[in-house]
Amino acid sequence: MNMEIAGHEFFDVDGSTIWYDLQTPRGEVFWLAAATPDGKRRWYHLDRDQWSVHFNISPDGKKFAGDGGDEEMVAHARDGKWIYLFTPRAIPDVAGISAPNADDLVHPGTLQAERLVDMKKHDYRLEPNIIFTRDGKWLIFRSNMHGDVHTYMVEVAKHAN
């Protein structure tokens, strides 16, 4: 697509699938997309305010996290300054109208977002760079929301069910 952009790549837990921020076109429609070693593609749609500078995946591969963004960034999010927990939801083919080559096409889905941390006082010139702990129970990120740069943790476990 003309004006399509992709970036801020990261790998799945096993290192075989690459995930990335996809915009079709730039700054208009937002996806968290994946390409697998066997050529399959998965695109999870998210709203403008849920777009994040960086995404990451939980150790069990069942959740994603995003570090949000502000109005100055490509999404121009009006209310996007949040640390997010995302649950992926595939869109099933319930109508039975699959294309003959459906396996070769993009498999669509959506991301159900939950806001974990209000980042409205964070200056996004410093990227939070979220990461899950190995046990998947916490997200670690950095922020200047209280002035100096500090490292923070937010519990995921109570939100992940």
Question: Where is each model-derived feature located?
Answer:
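A short beta-strand motif characteristic of beta-propeller blades
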Residues: M1, R41-L46, R115-M119
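Conserved beta-propeller blade repeats
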Residues: M1-D21, R48-M73, K121-L139
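Hydrophobic beta-strand positions in blades of beta-propellers and related beta-sheet-rich domains
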Residues: E9, F30-A34, K81-L85, I130, ...
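Short strand-connecting beta-turns/loops that link adjacent beta-strands
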Residues: D14, P25-R26, D38, D60, ...
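Flexible loop/turn segments at secondary-structure boundaries
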Residues: G27, M73, D123-Y124, G147-V149
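Loop/turn-rich, solvent-exposed surfaces of beta-rich toroidal or solenoidal domains
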Residues: G27-F30, L46-L111
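Short loop/turn segments that connect beta-strands within beta-propeller blades
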Residues: T36-G39, R89, A157
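Blade-level signature of beta-propeller repeat domains, shared across WD40, Kelch, NHL, RCC1
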Residues: L126-N161
